[in-house]
């Protein structure tokens, strides 16, 4: 690994994240709230950036794959640690709790260790939502879009941070694509904030919830989340923005250039919409038959919760802990799958589900016709054996990690259903789980061991395992290669 190059790029990222703290600092100034936690946190960011810049290389032209992975993984770890300080220095959280809150925000998980949001300063509430927005599209993507000075290494870093087996990484002009993705991201955020304001939210709440929605994060300014707002039009608008944020943002760029038909031609997005529709129908029928709800109420409850958990946003409008077990199992499946590759959603990704299904049918056809050459295709694209192997490996790591986290959380005292639900919720970055960690619960009373497990699980889920796990390979740190 080229330590000088990696240090130089992480220095730029940490300095940029220090500048981001100006926004909550200004919020604190205008609201006459404590500003020192943000000033000290900014100082730490700039001091670390200066140290890394001193150790780093002045001019970065290229990155090899290993350096790109190192920059992405280490910058996420570094920024997660730096962003715990506003919480800790405010005297609101312990260091471990502050780290969990920081990681939950940046990874878009959206679960909180705060027991009561109503007592928090507005600057802290805004900072929480801002971490969602920064991590949603991706720290690296936003960095490349605003400060495109990493040379050809930009593609390496974005490749390591991207979600799904294929996404914006396939575009050769990566800097232009990063700018286009950021423009779409910003447009959606501003649109959501304006519509939420028109539908009854105050401006501060609208901005915070817009950050959370488009980043598919889930942090709210209210303890009750979206359930606080008893407004059907508002809930429908939140559903709309959660769903569009679950699609590959690259298709919006393509739709701008080639027309809206691109959206309807995208196989992955159509499959995602079908999954949400099927879950909504099944859950609403279950609620009508077992809970006696009227059809309109059942449909709205089912649609909102299906959109929230499939997009891994995690907003709560209804307590699904009171739902029948059949509906809860469907919600777990939605969290496990998640949204589309190249979106702000977490989870396994619909793309991988499609490829796993296509691979299964290809194997069955190969059994019938042993001499046939069968190519796996999805969305009009051929997938190589190496790509399919990566999908299978990711599926294995994803599921085995969930089982491992379940065992560790259960060892800390949780029952198995609660531990399994929490493991899926953190690996998929969806937030709310089931049982002890359900829709109306927070993580304030969670054992320290469990908090450490979920912190690692959230990071692994956001960086899609490979980027983080590769740091544990001894060969990764050798100077002369693998």
Per-range role (PLM):
Residues 1-482:
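Membrane-proximal intracellular helices of multi-pass ion channels
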